Amino acid sequence: MTEIIQELDLNGEMLVRREKLAALRAKGNAFPNTFRRNALAQDLHTQYDEIESESLKTQGIEVKVAGRIMTRRVMGKATFITLQDMSGKIQLYVARDNLAEGVYTDDVGNWDLGDIVGVKGTLFKTKTNELTIRATEVHLLTKALRPLPNKFHGLSDQETRYRQRYLDLIANEDSRRTFIIRSKVIAGIREYFISKGFMEVETPMLQIIPGGASARPFITHHNALDVDMYLRIAPELYLKRLVVGGFERVFELNRNFRNEGVSIRHNPEFTMLEYYQAYADYHDLMDNTEELLRKLALDILGTTIVPYGDLKFDFGKPFERITMHEAILKYGAEQGIVKEDLYDFDRAVAVAQKLGIEVQKSWGLGSLVNAIFEEVAEHHLIQPTFLMAHPAEISPLARRNDENPDVTDRFELFIGGREIGNGFSELNDAEDQNERFDAQVAAKEAGDDEAMFKDEDFVTALEHGLPPTAGEGLGIDRLAMLFANANSIRDVILFPAMKTKS
């Protein structure tokens, strides 16, 4: 019953607003586009909040602002309005006697919450010392036909916030702050790599062979070529082709797509940084990553201590570096896991089954060890930690370790028990790469939907010679979650994947 009443109220209010718009149309141009502002709300606060009232009065500072009406208090012949623009809010004082004859009654009197207006006026301070603009000229720029959510008492319904992000951005200052932080993360990353001599590039989104990661791809069809194609799951193989071609430092900030589950940590469409550096190894990349994250924290938050929920991550001190085996033995001791369990297939199967892990037929020892790590150790990696020495079986593109060829020169960055990044010294042995691709094909034929496709052209590229190279991918969405203190990945993606409303 309440919903019906609310719908009737909404329809009634929209009818009134449409009538006001019709009256504007009858007068002429209902959507003018000639007003030009010369100031933003936050800039005015920054520049004039500390100026004394008398000084403002003497200076007679004239400004032009534009934005959305968020609140309105009518006090007879004057109205106080809160105006919101992209930078923040500022108060307007709109009085009948300061405007041309008839404007206050005929124009301002018909303004509604949500309308977009342009205002010219002078700065002053109210009795409560609030910086305010005394309007001398006003313009209705856009008539809002729908009222703000809940008369702007807030927008708390989570699903509505995701489906109608524009309302969320209007109503919730925290959401606007989150996406400003996300933008700063991306800008900071781009600035860092350009300053280090990297070249930004773009590689195909539509691919004949989806490669560069183990994941289930989205499939589409190219009508003109009459061929199935895939949305990319990673740009890795194309970026390494560029290193073969002589671009020795490259990076890309772009979207990847993986046809997998949706959760607070996963969205099928997500943003990644991938970069490749010739004549470097995975140790160099770990150093780069520490430096980058420390810089981002300082630039965005002004400190290397990053608050996240009840936790605080310290980006100021060296990140811990630990191998996968070391992590399992450290955090799996209570389950009775010993070193020998990680080097024998049957013993590893027994440990996995004891932990309740569903062992897949296609798994070898490396996959078992990885599954055991995810079960007993991953969630313990709270402070920034580089996990190293992953099994070669689960790292088909990474260079084998010189001392132990069963593992690779690879790392994953964990913060708060979540993987944030993945990097390794690149496999540049074309014959070894070909064999590993064949192993991935066998795994796919055995039922592993996430095993990699074989890319013959990439093997050909390696045969021309890839210099010693290291590469890394960092999840932008998860970094944004960290710096914005957001609990869900949907909170940092402007338009997250949502099931269609029935």
Curated annotation (Swiss-Prot):
Catalytic activity, EC: 6.1.1.6
Would you tell me the Gene Ontology cellular component terms?
cytosol
Q: Name one GO biological process term.
A: lysyl-tRNA aminoacylation
The protein's predominant localisation is cytoplasm
Recorded hits in InterPro entries, A to Z, give: Aa-tRNA-synt_II, aa-tRNA-synth_II, aa-tRNA-synth_II/BPL/LPL, Lys-tRNA-ligase_II, Lys-tRNA-ligase_II_bac/euk, Lys-tRNA-ligase_II_N, Lys-tRNA-synth_II_C, NA-bd_OB-fold
Reaction catalysed by this chain?
Answer: tRNA(Lys) + L-lysine + ATP = L-lysyl-tRNA(Lys) + AMP + diphosphate
> What molecular functions are annotated in GO for this chain?
ATP binding; lysine-tRNA ligase activity; magnesium ion binding; tRNA binding
Oligomeric state and interaction partners are given as: Homodimer.
Q: In which family does this protein belong, per the annotation?
A: Belongs to the class-II aminoacyl-tRNA synthetase family.
Q: Can you name this protein?
A: Lysine--tRNA ligase
